[in-house]
């Protein structure tokens, strides 16, 4: 059994659409990023890479490589998951927490879970996504940024029960 942790934070300030967990969320501003800025996917990729001791998202998809400019982060997730499948790992559990003062995430969480379930070929019950605020503290509290924490548990050569 392997456990990995990932974190990402992006500031608001882009004209890009706000996409979190592969879901388009209505918002007047997007997140500043080289890719499409899907910080949930980015933190999840880092957790998967951490669990398999394969490095971090930047080592696979460097921000100075134009090929990844504005790329759909779900494509990046699928590329990483395909590498992990070759190592005979399966997902036991994914636990994700989004920290955002704005916009509210609750109406979109089911769709985020559905996207991850599809992309990672795992049961939706293996995926937990929660959201909270920073109690109006710091850059997140001032609605300048959104952060995300992800934890992944993988098992090799068999399915989790």
Curated annotation (Swiss-Prot):
Binds 1 divalent metal cation per subunit. GO terms for molecular function: 2-C-methyl-D-erythritol 2,4-cyclodiphosphate synthase activity; metal ion binding. The keyword GTP-binding does not apply. It catalyses: 4-CDP-2-C-methyl-D-erythritol 2-phosphate = 2-C-methyl-D-erythritol 2,4-cyclic diphosphate + CMP. 4-CDP-2-C-methyl-D-erythritol 2-phosphate binds at residues 8-10, 34-35, 56-58, 100-106, 142. A divalent metal cation binds at residues 8, 10, 42. Involved in the biosynthesis of isopentenyl diphosphate (IPP) and dimethylallyl diphosphate (DMAPP), two major building blocks of isoprenoid compounds. Catalyzes the conversion of 4-diphosphocytidyl-2-C-methyl-D-erythritol 2-phosphate (CDP-ME2P) to 2-C-methyl-D-erythritol 2,4-cyclodiphosphate (ME-CPP) with a corresponding release of cytidine 5-monophosphate (CMP). This is 2-C-methyl-D-erythritol 2,4-cyclodiphosphate synthase. It comes from Buchnera aphidicola subsp. Acyrthosiphon pisum (strain APS). The gene is ispF.
